[in-house]
């Protein structure tokens, strides 16, 4: 018996919608990364993108445990000498609501072209509304 390897054109992608209200950042990101990679499917193949699309609503209501709202730091650099900027989780959520979740999920996906393709299937929205109703996403409880 040969080892099964999924073909890219044989993969059936589904759409899921997740309500992130009062969900913990890391636990939510772990399940989303798992869905984006396709590890929940029997046809999972590491070198093929077998994952599904995930739409996350209410990303502005994600929480973190403990004192991480103040202590968790995000860094970015302007490209100039001394141009490093530091922002905590609380300010990041106010300014860019979806970026904390995207950063957490990005760290859990493979690095390289395959990981970038998987990350494009993540859609984050601050409110309850999203423009993907035509895809008829299934509700996913996490």
Curated annotation (Swiss-Prot):
Identify the keywords attached in UniProt to this record, alphabetized: Ribonucleoprotein, Ribosomal protein
GO function terms (MF aspect):
mRNA binding; structural constituent of ribosome
| Entry annotated with the keyword Ribosomal protein | yes
- Which CDD domains does the record cross-reference, listed alphabetically? Ribosomal_L13 (cd00392)
Which Gene Ontology cellular-component terms appear in the entry?
cytosolic large ribosomal subunit
Superkingdom is: Bacteria
GO BP terms in the entry: negative regulation of translation; translation
Q: Sum up the protein's function in the record's words.
A: This protein is one of the early assembly proteins of the 50S ribosomal subunit, although it is not seen to bind rRNA by itself. It is important during the early stages of 50S assembly.
Task: Give the family from UniProt.
Answer: Belongs to the universal ribosomal protein uL13 family.
Q: How does it assemble?
A: Part of the 50S ribosomal subunit.
Q: Can you name this protein?
A: Large ribosomal subunit protein uL13
**Annotated organism of origin:** Dechloromonas aromatica (strain RCB)
């Amino acid at each position: 018996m040969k080892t099964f390897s999924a073909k890219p054109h044989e993969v059936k992608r589904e759409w899921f919608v997740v309500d992130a209200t009062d969900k913990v950042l890391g636990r939510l990101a772990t399940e989303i990364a798992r869905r984006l990679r396709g590890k929940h499917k029997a046809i999972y193949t590491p070198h093929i993108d077998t994952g599904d699309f995930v739409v996350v609503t209410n990303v502005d209501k994600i929480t973190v445990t403990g004192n991480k709202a103040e202590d968790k730091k995000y860094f970015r650099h302007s490209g100039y000498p001394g141009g490093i900027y530091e922002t905590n989780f609380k300010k990041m959520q106010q300014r860019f609501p979806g970026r904390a979740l995207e950063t957490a999920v990005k760290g859990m996906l493979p690095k390289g072209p395959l990981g970038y393709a998987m990350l494009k299937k993540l859609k984050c929205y601050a409110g309850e509304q999203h423009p993907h109703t035509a895809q008829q996403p299934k509700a996913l409880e996490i």
